[in-house]
């Protein structure tokens, strides 16, 4: 078999007809600047062709469901294996998708509980077991010899009434004795029962002494008792002991019933097992009292009830005033000072009690009626669910929040599933086991107490679960829980989960293509990830990893550097060889960083800030352990810590949302904290994340940064435009007039293929240029508007150098390292890192107030060390203007450049949530307990 993948003439995107050889069964890292063509080579050429060939080998019938895959622009590829891509863009946003379902661990857990689980009565009556007549007979015969007993069939359990017809039927069926409320009577001599009291009635089927030769009689009596007692029977051993048996999974005491244990009972995605209240989501949209009464110190007259604000309408305030007068509630008392009964009345209504309501609207319409008072919470709920108006529904939605389901307590399953425990009544139910971190889950599996029979059944199931948990542990995800929603995972986390699933499959001879698996991973966990990658390689697989992490590069078997620049300045193979060979290559920027010839210098001094702080006290969301944190303003701050230590919770869930709530009146509720101070020192909050800058191809760098408005102004001022009477709007592809109407200014036509993927083809009228021919006849410096949109940022900067207003905005895009993108490049084609830098560019040309807080979550994602150097210069410009920049980051080059570090830990999950170290990088490097400090110390010494 060929030991190389040989590629000839690859031309996808910016690749310049390249030839490259990649060794098989090795760990190969593809690196290079952002936009240099790494992904074009790895994903759009190698993976696309591997996938296409696999699909081509399937039948025509199967292919119609998979769609026809386009052949990548390449002359030939030899030595390809079936390819599996593990990227970061395919995270499921479905609320039913969890870590447990993605890794298939849930499937094995469901099987485990169905096979060795024991149901327990939810009312505390002990284990619920189902026994056949044969099993009951065996248990009775196991009682001590000469035990006197009577077999009873329970027919009435805790029911009121005289039950005369039941006694008549018992007599008719030929039975002689009954036990009523614990006393034995002849069926003809039962005293009259009280109608208003609850009674228990059992029929005496037989009286026996346990001795040889009674099996046959006992069996007949047991069957008769089960038949008469609807599957239940009691054995009264005359010495005061009673044994309860059932041939159903049903509690003999209270009748709580469990269906037959099967895997679907433990699935929250099946109606059979899901919680009936939340339909298996674990959360329910409920009215949030904190949003309904945002300021409890206000009285009802002062507008304590936000949904009934008199500004929008006086209907509900009038109703409130008249109802409170009728029920004797003082409208001038602060809401928090009302009695509990009064608050319940205001919130949930008066029930059946009515008041007289009189109201005249602005048009003279009158309402004069006696009605119950609805209550504000009930009112918001009703209007949300009953309205046909999207506007009203959105307004009501603003007073609601997704709260933990009160029925299943967030476990997603019904009572019948949650009453089943493994390892005895003290053992966990499936909901509790899913709430454990991966590390704790592993420990629990090792300590599980099972009977010999249960161990035999559970052994192969537990092995599968254990293996999958171990793989997750090995890729640095030990802090995650199986119940964690897949939509809340970062790109790096979801990729490593799928990586763990692939390791678990133990396939060999496969070509795996990974996109920056080290994202979101602390340096401490990186070694474990690299070991996992090597393990996959050692199974006989080829791994092609697009990566910027130096450790991964140095441990690779083969390194390919794509460059030298980005966009049209990239697309060539600059270096290919072992890491040591690439490090010696003078043309390779990557090689220069690996050899230490190029590096990001440590700042000569740290900024002292402006002396002000934002201080959070008692941060206790998720795993945060009631932290008190100070964020010094006017500095470059890095929040660090191992994966799962609580960085995102502190910054994104608490700080960002609390500031947004105060500054922007954002309805999004922050996580749990006691108090926050210092927000008055901030005027603007700018969250610069990696979400797309636009959801449609109509959004592009020119429109996003606002430079397109200036360019359209310029074209409208040309002589040709003035002669034709064209205004600025003529040069927009979003409105009628100048755009091509055949494609509505998209430049492409979408052809719906029904069960195949939609196909996009260039518009035949405008040939992809978006405008009609008349608009394209207007030129500025011999270029029309479509040609300007096709220019790269670098070219546009030269082209518009004489127009300072335009050049200044374009310069900011170049400053963030995006000189290679075209002005009209669709936003949907930009990577997360490129979108984030585009947002930075749009901030750069705004006038700085010096009171802005910029928050960035892992801004180095997708960035080469050379790009990081550029990014740091941009961030430092913000700080030098007096603003505060706060980053969540693992990259040591960024961390060492910060003025102030807040290091969380020491571990992830329950072992984290504490502040391990704070201060300058030099101070944190001296803290022995800090993992970040340990790696930072080495970096600072370099």
UniProtKB/Swiss-Prot annotation:
InterPro entries: AAA+_ATPase, ABC_transporter-like_ATP-bd, ABC_transporter-like_CS, P-loop_NTPase, UvrA, UvrA_DNA-bd, UvrA_inter
Domain ABC transporter residue range list: 308-589, 609-937
Binding residues for ATP: 32-39, 641-648
Compartments it resides in: Cytoplasm
PROSITE patterns, per the entry: ABC_TRANSPORTER_1, ABC_TRANSPORTER_2
Function summary: The UvrABC repair system catalyzes the recognition and processing of DNA lesions. UvrA is an ATPase and a DNA-binding protein. A damage recognition complex composed of 2 UvrA and 2 UvrB subunits scans DNA for abnormalities. When the presence of a lesion has been verified by UvrB, the UvrA molecules dissociate.
Chain intervals annotated as zinc finger (C4-type): 251-278, 740-766
KW tRNA-binding (keyword) present: no
A GO cellular-component term linked to this record: excinuclease repair complex
Protein name, per record: UvrABC system protein A
Family, per entry: Belongs to the ABC transporter superfamily. UvrA family.
Protein keywords: ATP-binding, Cytoplasm, DNA damage, DNA excision, DNA repair, DNA-binding, Excision nuclease, Metal-binding, Nucleotide-binding, Repeat, SOS response, Zinc, Zinc-finger
Molecular function (Gene Ontology), one example: zinc ion binding
Principal localisation: cytoplasm
Pfam families reported in the protein's UniProt record: UvrA_DNA-bind, UvrA_inter
Keyword Amino-acid biosynthesis applies: no
Any GO BP annotation: nucleotide-excision repair
Subunit structure: Forms a heterotetramer with UvrB during the search for lesions.
PANTHER family in the record: UVRABC SYSTEM PROTEIN A (PTHR43152:SF3)
């Amino acid at each position: 078999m060929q030991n190389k993948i040989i590629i000839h003439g690859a031309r996808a995107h910016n690749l310049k007809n390249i030839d490259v050889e990649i060794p098989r069964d090795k760990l190969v890292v593809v690196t290079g600047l952002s936009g240099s063509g790494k992904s074009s080579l790895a994903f759009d050429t190698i993976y696309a062709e591997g996938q296409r060939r696999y699909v081509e080998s399937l039948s025509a019938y199967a292919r119609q469901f998979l769609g026809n895959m386009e052949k990548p622009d390449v002359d030939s590829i030899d030595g390809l294996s079936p390819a599996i891509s593990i990227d970061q863009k395919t995270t499921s946003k479905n609320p039913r998708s969890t870590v447990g379902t993605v890794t298939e661990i849930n499937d094995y857990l469901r099987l485990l509980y169905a096979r060795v689980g024991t149901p327990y009565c939810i009312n505390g009556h002990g284990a619920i077991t189902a026994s056949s007549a044969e099993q009951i007979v065996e248990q009775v015969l196991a009682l001590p010899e000469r035990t006197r007993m009577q077999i009873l069939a329970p027919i009435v359990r805790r029911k009121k009434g005289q039950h005369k017809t039941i006694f008549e039927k018992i007599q008719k069926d030929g039975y002689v004795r009954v036990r009523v409320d614990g006393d034995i009577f002849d069926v003809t001599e039962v005293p009259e029962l009280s109608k208003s009291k609850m009674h228990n009635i059992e029929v005496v089927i037989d009286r026996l002494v346990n001795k040889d030769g009674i099996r046959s009689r006992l069996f007949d009596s047991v069957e008769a008792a089960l038949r008469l007692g609807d599957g239940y029977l009691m054995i009264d051993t005359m010495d005061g002991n009673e044994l309860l048996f059932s041939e159903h999974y049903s509690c003999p005491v209270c009748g709580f019933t469990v269906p037959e244990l099967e895997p679907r009972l433990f699935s929250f995605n099946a109606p059979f097992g899901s919680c009936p209240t939340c339909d298996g989501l674990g959360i329910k949209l409920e009215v949030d009292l904190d949003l309904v009464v945002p300021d409890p110190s206000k009285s009802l007259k002062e507008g304590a009830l936000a949904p009934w604000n008199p500004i929008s309408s006086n209907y509900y305030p009038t109703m409130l005033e008249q109802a409170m007068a009728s029920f004797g509630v003082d409208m001038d008392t602060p809401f928090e000072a009302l009695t509990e009964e009064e608050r319940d009345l205001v919130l949930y209504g008066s029930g059946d009690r009515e008041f007289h309501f009189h109201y005249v609207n602005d048009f003279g319409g009158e309402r004069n009626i006696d009605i119950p008072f609805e209550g504000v919470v009930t009112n918001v709920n009703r209007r949300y669910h009953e309205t046909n108006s999207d506007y009203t529904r959105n307004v009501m939605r603003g007073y609601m929040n997704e709260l933990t389901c009160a029925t299943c307590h967030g476990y997603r399953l019904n009572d019948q599933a949650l009453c089943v425990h493994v390892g005895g009544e003290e053992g966990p139910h499936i909901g509790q086991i899913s709430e454990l971190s991966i590390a704790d889950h592993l420990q629990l599996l090792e300590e599980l107490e099972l009977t010999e029979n249960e161990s035999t059944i559970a052994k192969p199931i537990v092995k599968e679960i254990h293996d999958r948990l171990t793989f997750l542990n090995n890729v640095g995800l030990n802090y995650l829980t199986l119940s964690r929603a897949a939509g809340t995972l970062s790109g790096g986390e979801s990729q490593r989960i799928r990586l763990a699933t692939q390791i678990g499959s133990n396939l060999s001879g496969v070509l795996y293509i990974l996109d920056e698996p080290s994202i979101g991973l602390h340096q401490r966990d990186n070694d474990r990830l690299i070991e996992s990658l090597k393990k996959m390689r050692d199974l006989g697989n080829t791994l092609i990893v697009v990566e910027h992490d130096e450790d991964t590069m140095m441990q690779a078997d083969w390194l390919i550097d794509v460059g030298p620049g980005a966009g049209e300045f990239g697309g060539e193979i600059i270096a290919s060889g072992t890491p040591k060979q690439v490090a010696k290559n003078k043309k390779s920027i990557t090689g220069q960083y690996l050899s230490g010839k190029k590096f990001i210098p440590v700042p000569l001094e740290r900024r002292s800030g402006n002396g002000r702080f934002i201080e959070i006290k008692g941060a206790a969301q998720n795993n945060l352990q009631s932290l008190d944190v100070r964020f010094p303003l006017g500095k470059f701050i890095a929040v660090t810590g191992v994966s799962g230590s609580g960085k995102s919770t502190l910054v994104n869930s608490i700080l960002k949302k609390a500031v947004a709530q105060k500054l922007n009146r954002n309805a999004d509720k922050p996580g749990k904290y006691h108090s926050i101070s210092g927000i008055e020192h901030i005027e603007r909050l700018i969250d610069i994340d990696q979400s797309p800058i636009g959801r449609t191809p109509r959004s592009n760098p020119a429109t996003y940064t606002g430079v397109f408005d200036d360019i359209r102004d310029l074209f409208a001022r040309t002589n040709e435009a003035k002669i034709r009477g064209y205004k600025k709007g003529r040069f927009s592809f979003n409105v009628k007039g100048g755009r091509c109407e055949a494609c509505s200014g998209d430049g492409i036509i979408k052809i719906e293929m029904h069960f195949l993927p939609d196909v996009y083809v260039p518009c035949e009228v405008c040939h992809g240029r978006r405008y009609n021919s008349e608009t394209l006849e207007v030129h500025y410096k011999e270029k029309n508007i479509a040609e300007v949109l096709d220019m790269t940022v670098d070219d546009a900067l030269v082209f518009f150098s004489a127009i300072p207003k335009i050049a200044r905005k374009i310069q900011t895009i170049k400053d963030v390292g995006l000189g290679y993108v075209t002005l009209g490049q669709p936003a949907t084609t930009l990577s997360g890192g490129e979108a984030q830098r585009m947002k930075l560019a749009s901030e750069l040309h705004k006038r700085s107030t010096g009171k802005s807080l910029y928050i960035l979550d892992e801004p180095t994602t997708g960035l080469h060390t050379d790009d990081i150097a550029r990014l740091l210069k941009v961030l430092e410009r913000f700080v030098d203007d007096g603003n505060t920049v706060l980053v969540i980051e693992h990259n040591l080059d960024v961390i060492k450049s910060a003025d102030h570090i807040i290091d969380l830990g020491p571990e992830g999950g329950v072992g984290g949530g504490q502040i391990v170290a704070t201060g300058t990088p030099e101070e944190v490097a001296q803290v022995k307990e800090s993992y970040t400090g340990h790696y930072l110390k080495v970096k600072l010494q370099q």
